[in-house]
Amino acid sequence: MSIDDLKSKIPDFAKDVRLNLSSMASDETLTPQQKYGLFVACGIASRNADVRKALVAEAAGKVDASVIQAAKAAASIMGMNNVYYRFVHLASNKDYRTMPARLRMNVISNPGVDKIDFELWSLAVSAINGCGMCIDAHEDVLRKANVTAEAIQAAVRFASIIQSAAIALEAADTE
């Protein structure tokens, strides 16, 4: 399955989603590694099998297998961190902010790819998962590494398009 296959599954009520998928596929704001890593990480974070399969297939052959593995790791580790740190951020009891997380997250310091690319993928997944604390932390690392606002915005735009594709497919499944 490819992005074109995925677009063909998007119903007419979500025509804008199809058009956004096309724009995303041809977007050259990011490096290929950043772009296809986002496809994989956000496809997994969408929790939709069709979206995940299409975007992983789209990335295969365009980037090294290590990029795909690292993007999978970003989605996985953010699945954990986003839940934990969203709780810490939203809980009225501020004591949780001073407690050690006691969560293993070694992959963040050694992702097997460029750390900035991994941060970009982590930011996008954090946007999908709605963790403001994680969004701020990853955006801060990216800005300190001189990543442009346009690149950061592109990553979050990709995340929003990918999530909307998953929702469109779920909505179509109700018909």
Swiss-Prot record:
One of its GO terms (biological process) is cell redox homeostasis. The active site is at residues 131, 134. It is an enzyme of class 1 (oxidoreductase). The keyword Glycosyltransferase does not apply. Keywords: Antioxidant, Disulfide bond, Oxidoreductase, Peroxidase, Redox-active center. Antioxidant protein with alkyl hydroperoxidase activity. Required for the reduction of the AhpC active site cysteine residues and for the regeneration of the AhpC enzyme activity. This is Alkyl hydroperoxide reductase AhpD. The lineage of its organism: Bacteria, Pseudomonadati, Pseudomonadota, Alphaproteobacteria, Hyphomicrobiales.
